[in-house]
A protein has these predicted regions:
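A short, conserved alpha-helix in the catalytic core of glycosyltransferases
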Residues: 98, 159-167, 171-176, 183-210
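Acidic donor-binding segment of Leloir-type glycosyltransferases
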Residues: 22-58
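Active-site donor/metal-binding and catalytic loop motifs
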Residues: 115, 183, 205-224
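Short, well-formed alpha-helical segments that are part of the catalytic scaffolds
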Residues: 11-24
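Short aromatic/hydrophobic "clamp" motif used to bind/position activated sugar donors
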Residues: 81
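Conserved donor NDP-sugar-binding/catalytic core segment of glycosyltransferases
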Residues: 92-134
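A recurrent flexible, glycine/aromatic-enriched loop bordering the glycosyltransferase active site
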Residues: 66, 144-169
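Glycine-rich, basic loop-to-helix element that forms the pyrophosphate-binding segment
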Residues: 59-76
Length: 258
């Protein structure tokens, strides 16, 4: 069994689709933890709709993505955890694929389908919808199944280090989880992947399971985009302060280094 951690903020429509795909796509009855990082009333209708299938961790106030994710992991009942953003869509049989491809002492990343070109050359680029309103879940599920058959790979590749994250809860705790000092969580993922790599975990990617990612649904205005860009720059500066140098990204295998 898997404990799924889904932090959510102010995107109830995205959360609804995320939960629908997660619940309908699973083979086993996994623990699904929705971490409500403030704005419970905004998400209340969606949470009540899926109440039978989920555990709700209501933080009552906005504590930030990193702390919210850490608290979600602390509440995981199973050793295997899957951390997923609420703007992701789960494919069919996602739990079986992940458990089959996972090996000990690793962090396994399911590949992603995105509608825009990405800096991660492993991602599959296909516009199946850039908003919740234009997305067809059944169409995605059928496309993803066909895609898996075309690019099926027997063993994962060492090109992980992107979200979503599938790993052992104990390994997550050993490396200290997300660093809660990163503004908006920007660059915290690079920091986390760096810690995992330095701790000896293999950073793996499976192409037998693709999640859809809408990419920055909440960044809808020039002001929000500017704020996000500034937060990212602040994140890189904090990483330099913490580690003594900026975190470097290898575009070939996505490994993070100093």
């Amino acid at each position: 069994m898997i404990s799924v951690i889904i932090p959510t903020y102010k995107e109830p429509e995205a959360l609804n689709l995320c939960l629908q795909s997660c619940i309908e796509g699973q083979v086993n009855k996994n623990q699904i933890i929705v971490v409500v990082d403030g704005f419970y009333d905004l998400n209340k209708e969606v949470l009540e709709k899926w109440a039978e299938y989920i555990d709700v961790l209501n933080l009552e106030q906005n504590v930030g993505l990193c702390r919210g994710t850490n608290l979600g992991v602390y509440n995981a009942q199973h050793d295997k955890i899957l951390i997923v953003n609420d703007d992701n869509v789960f494919p069919l049989n996602w739990d079986i694929h992940l458990e089959t491809d996972y090996i000990e002492n690793s962090l396994l990343t399911p590949n992603q389908i995105e509608p825009y070109p990405s800096i991660f050359n492993q991602f599959h680029i296909k516009d199946l919808g850039r908003s919740i309103d234009t997305f067809d879940l059944k169409c995605f599920q059928e496309y993803e199944k066909t895609l898996n058959e075309i690019i099926y790979k027997k063993t994962p590749e060492e090109t992980g280090s992107t979200l979503p994250i599938f790993m052992s809860k104990m390994d997550y705790l050993k490396v200290g989880g997300w660093d809660e000092n990163y503004e908006l969580g920007m660059v915290a993922d690079w920091d986390f992947f760096l810690k995992c790599h330095l701790s000896g975990l293999k950073m793996l990617r499976t192409y037998n399971c693709h999640f859809y990612h809408f990419v920055s649904l909440s960044t809808t205005t020039p002001e929000k985009l500017t704020y996000r860009q500034q937060s990212e720059q602040n994140g890189h500066e904090y990483a330099k302060y913490k580690w003594g140098s900026y975190i470097k990204h290898n575009p070939q295998n996505n490994l993070k280094s100093l």
